[in-house]
Amino acid sequence: LFYSHLEDYINNLYKTLSINNPKQLSIALLAKKLDVEVYYGNVSFLFGDKVVIKRSTKQQEWQEFGHEIGHYLRHVGNHLSMNTLFINLQEYQADNFAYHFCIPTFMLQEVKDINIYTISETFDVDYEFARHRLDMHNNKLLFASGK
């Protein structure tokens, strides 16, 4: 199975951080390893190396953390001075990053019975997030098979 540039990036990131199984995927551990400070508030945003996560369920907070880390690792610049289309692009990229960061392909491939429930339980994400990530994974497999 081929990996996209983003999947390679996340695979290498996790290998560098010695993260190799879903039980290691936690905000506290990854924040420490990535040297970012995490705070909780009414909205999610990134300010330098400080990640503010909107208070919510554990699953939603993990997903928001993935989104903000996407900005932290992959984007530079101030949203206030950017064109709306570029902001939208960066938000789309951060969303896509979150799906792969929270449910890395190299770990997903190790799940025995891949379905929405097992993804949700294994990676501690909510149902919709798991459903979307499963769709992404299935589309990738379908594309790879040439059908």
What annotation goes with each model-predicted range?
Residues L1-K147:
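Active-site hotspot residues in diverse enzymes, especially metal/ion-binding acidic/histidine motifs
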